[in-house]
Design a protein with these regions (language model features):
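Core residues of bacterial helix-turn-helix
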Residues: 20, 31-32, 63
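DNA major-groove recognition helix of helix-turn-helix/homeodomain DNA-binding modules
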Residues: 52-69
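Residue-level signal for the short linker/turn that defines the boundary of a DNA-recognition helix
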Residues: 11, 21-22, 51-54
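The alpha-helix within a helix-turn-helix
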Residues: 17, 28, 60
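Conserved hydrophobic/aromatic packing and binding residues within compact polymer-binding modules
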Residues: 13, 24-28, 39-42, 70
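A short, Lys/Arg-rich alpha-helix, primarily the initiator
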Residues: 1-20
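Short, charged recognition helix plus adjacent turn
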Residues: 2, 71-97
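Recognition helix of helix-turn-helix/homeodomain-like DNA-binding domains
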Residues: 32-50
Length: 97
């Protein structure tokens, strides 16, 4: 089962993909995946698959979206720098856990 944090990041990527009229096949190609079906599995809450941190980085770059915004909400992005970075690191660790 995916965590709330994993679902948040995956849903943001899906919304970015759909907003730019990009297909799951396009995402699969960006990530050098063998099948767009894997992207479907990642986007589905029914399967445990998730993007790796490297894949999220590639997708954020492709969709011109700040990587940290996958993990931090608007309020958290306004925290002082050190506090924000510490929170971001902890959330990235939680995502990957």
């Amino acid at each position: 089962m995916k965590t709330d944090l994993q679902l948040r990041a995956i849903n943001i990527i899906r919304e970015l993909r759909q907003g730019q009229n990009a297909s799951q096949a396009y995402v699969a190609e960006l990530l050098d995946l063998r099948s767009s079906g894997l992207v479907g599995n990642i986007e589905s809450p029914r399967f445990p698959h998730k993007y790796t941190l490297k894949q999220l980085s590639v997708l954020c770059e492709a969709f011109q979206y700040p990587f940290e915004n996958l993990f931090l909400d608007e309020k958290e992005t306004l925290l002082p720098y050190k506090e924000r970075i510490k929170l971001l690191i902890n959330k990235i660790i939680d995502y990957d856990g």
